[in-house]
Amino acid sequence: MVKHQPLQYYEPQLCLSCLTGIYGCRWKRYQRSHDDTTKWERLWFLILTSSFFLTLVWFYFWWEVHNDYNEINWFLYNRMGYWSDWSIPILVTTAAGFTYITVLLILALCHIAVGQQMNLHWLHKIGLMTTLITTVVTMSSIAQLWDDEWEMVFISLQATAPFLHIGALAAVTALSWLIAGQFARMEKATSQMLMVTAYLAVVVALYLVPLTISSPCIMEKKALGPKPAIIGHRGAPMLAPENTLMSFQKAVEQKIYGVQADVILSYDGVPFLMHDKTLRRTTNVEEVFPGRAYEHSSMFNWTDLEMLNAGEWFLRNDPFWTAGSLSRSDYLEAANQSVCKLADMLEVIKDNTSLILNFQDLPPDHPYYTSYINITLKTILASGIQQQAVMWLPDTERQLVRQIAPAFQQTSGLKLDAERLREKGIVKLNLRYTKVTNEDVRDYMAANLSVNLYTVNEPWLYSILWCTGVPSVTSDSSHVLRKVPFPIWLMPPDEYRLIWITSDLISFIIIVGVFIFQNYHNDQWRLGSIRTYNPEQIMLSAAVRRSSRDVKIMKEKLIFSEINNGVETTDELSLCSENGYANEMVTPTDHRDTRLRMN
């Protein structure tokens, strides 16, 4: 019986197999190659890199607009006709796409690091293009439908830019190992210069980025102004259904500065609270009056409005994901809320709470179309609330309002020059936080005009506005913001400059050290680390990438070895690369008939 022994045994390379297998479905040794990556695959790598940065921006955008998720859902509700929480599915999908692209990019960079030829599998190419196209379409849709929300990105950078800069600096510094390794192995000086120039341009740009960073929270602690007052948006809509009596009771319990309410008149002249033009979103009108669900809310008599439930929708749709945290008693109370009269709300808040009133325009055929201002004023004055506590927002009949209630704070929702506002008798502005800059706030304050910004729900945004000097904000999450004792971060300018310069110096030292080490290590490998060669190693070695010059040297040494010594056997051949990867070969101990042949 003849016993056959293998000429060679290659130790398994599990990590390398997983790397090339996941990226290009090349799990076997013979499927891998250290040849140069084709131009087609380089194009796919460029697409992959571009997709990474695009999905990074989109993921950052969607994470930061968490402040406005409810507004986004309400906006889509008005366009689509039904309520659904679109924010979380979009966030989850965006996070999944970003994670997928990031993993592919890391695998591609690992291919470069170990000298493997990149060959992205066709399934990944489909997934990459699907993710890219979906992201582009979604971003374009948001830009067209809600371009105002992109201002949120620039505002958020005031809070995150100093930290994003350090993170980007760490990432680019870490890439120096890969760049330096490629630089050391390149044979053409032109290619080396192009690579180093491009890399250094990125590094220098990052070093200088702090010159463009402007954040109001980079300031001395003693210059920090008072904490902005908090106004509950439609009461406390995270703790109770919006514009209901329970919502305003919860707001008063929070001991906040004021509340905001949306007022409209019923068909028989009773002022009540409702934000939408119809009753579909916040009541069960489709069950009680199915034929009138799309009618304007002002076309219902008060006796009809009293029949509607205004709380079940809150528990069913859970717009702020807070319904599950309600106590048993609050849950039952919320389920039984009804449409709220203006007079009932005023009775709850009249003692120590300010009020911003917003009005809906009535249809022209409404019986009180021309007199609803008078009716509302009578209701407010009859409640006993102090006139100084009322911020009057509608531009309609301002002169009449001044005559009847001269102490009302005349408030405007329009961004105009301070001089024009003063001429109109405006003392307060109520604007969306994306509509004003830090300079606008300071100019208005210098002109003795108070500014209230809406809708501010996140502590980081509240902190930025606090550092800016905003006097008050309107919020859905008053119970959260009232517990913010201090801006999330506040840094003196000298301290920030010290962190900036120190980070740049550390990065520079690491980059220079990496380039020196990689060049020294590569020179040592070329001069003395190559001991013996085997043609099978040249063909099958997949752990490292060697230049054509290195492969030529190995082949020449093998040929001269056979000429000088004849056909010999070797006990063990081992080749280590400059990257630290070993492709070891073990031969049998019985060498009687073993021969190495060159084809």
Swiss-Prot record:
- The chain's Cytoplasmic topological domains, given as residue ranges, are 1-42, 109-125, 182-192, 519-599
User: Where, subcellularly, is it found?
Assistant: Endomembrane system; Cytoplasm, Perinuclear region; Cell projection, Growth cone
List the Extracellular topological domains. Answer: 64-87, 147-160, 214-497
Q: Does the keyword 4Fe-4S apply?
A: no
Documented EC number(s): 3.1.4.2, 3.1.4.11
What tissues contain this protein? Detected in mature motor neurons.
Disulfide partners: C15-C18, C25-C576
Residues modified by glycosylation: N301, N336, N352, N374, N448
Where are the membrane-spanning stretches? 43-63, 88-108, 126-146, 161-181, 193-213, 498-518
Task: Extract one GO cellular component term from the record.
Answer: endomembrane system
Checking CDD domains in the record gives: GDPD_GDE2
Modulation of this protein's activity: Activated by PRDX1 by reduction of an intramolecular disulfide bond.
Instruction: Tell me, in a sentence or two, what this protein's role is.
Output: Glycerophosphodiester phosphodiesterase that promotes cell cycle exit and drives spinal motor neuron differentiation. Mediates the cleavage of glycosylphosphatidylinositol (GPI) anchor of target proteins: removes the GPI-anchor of RECK, leading to release RECK from the plasma membrane. May contribute to the osmotic regulation of cellular glycerophosphocholine.
Q: What is this protein called?
A: Glycerophosphodiester phosphodiesterase domain-containing protein 5
Organism the protein comes from:
Gallus gallus (Chicken)
